């Protein structure tokens, strides 16, 4: 499957619509996220490594907000616990269709991968099976803020003792100087990856009402309120971070 360069915002738009994960985004998503999220490949590959430590036999491993299945593929490559299966969930029909294609291609290249089920569903309404690993890779930031605690509480209830939630998010910072610095460094990262000022500005307009990042402290406080006993930051690159939350 060919991967197209992200040129979605390269031409001036009279009105910039809110960002949605539609077919246009799906076509360029691998290029978009690689050029927009510093550290993304490192997070994805190591999610599988981390999951292998917490995965337990005969349990579910969830990839919530699976998009094109990069995390699911990492889980399948690294986890070897008997009887595990991956449940990849996304609410975008276009993402789910392409995700299934990528996973079929992975099956043709590798043997003895974990079985996988791909669901087109709203994770806010999803009934969770007993799970040893739940991955949310840049997903919670697209959930309405007043619905995040309830979702995390349900995930906590589904997690078995010894399991883990691995949560990756874009961060904002309470300190104004820190926020401004890391925001500018992130823009420099995008410029270095070939995005023009027009593309950066229009993408920001499209996503600012859709993605609502939290501070690290807000994440830690919410996870504790949801019933997690320990929250361990394991990765940060600029204003993007990943946490391990233990039940």
Curated annotation (Swiss-Prot):
Q: Which organism is it from?
A: Pseudomonas putida (strain GB-1)
Record text on subunit structure and interactions: Homodimer.
Looking up SUPFAM superfamilies in the UniProt record yields: S-adenosyl-L-methionine-dependent methyltransferases
For biological process, the GO terms are: tRNA wobble uridine modification
Q: Name one GO molecular function term.
A: S-adenosyl-L-methionine binding
Q: Where does S-adenosyl-L-methionine bind?
A: 40, 65-67, 90-91, 122-123, 137, 204
Give the transmembrane ranges. none
> Into which family does the record put it?
Belongs to the class I-like SAM-binding methyltransferase superfamily. Cx-SAM synthase family.
The keyword Transferase is annotated on this UniProt entry? yes
Q: Which UniProt keywords apply?
A: S-adenosyl-L-methionine, Transferase
Fetch the InterPro entries from UniProt. CmoA, Methyltransf_25, SAM-dependent_MTases_sf
Establish whether keyword Signal is in the entry.
no
What's the stated role of this polypeptide? Catalyzes the conversion of S-adenosyl-L-methionine (SAM) to carboxy-S-adenosyl-L-methionine (Cx-SAM).
The EC number(s) given in the record are 2.1.3.-
Matching PANTHER family, A to Z?
Answer: CARBOXY-S-ADENOSYL-L-METHIONINE SYNTHASE, TRANS-ACONITATE 2-METHYLTRANSFERASE-RELATED
Catalytic activity field: prephenate + S-adenosyl-L-methionine = carboxy-S-adenosyl-L-methionine + 3-phenylpyruvate + H2O
- Protein name, please? Carboxy-S-adenosyl-L-methionine synthase
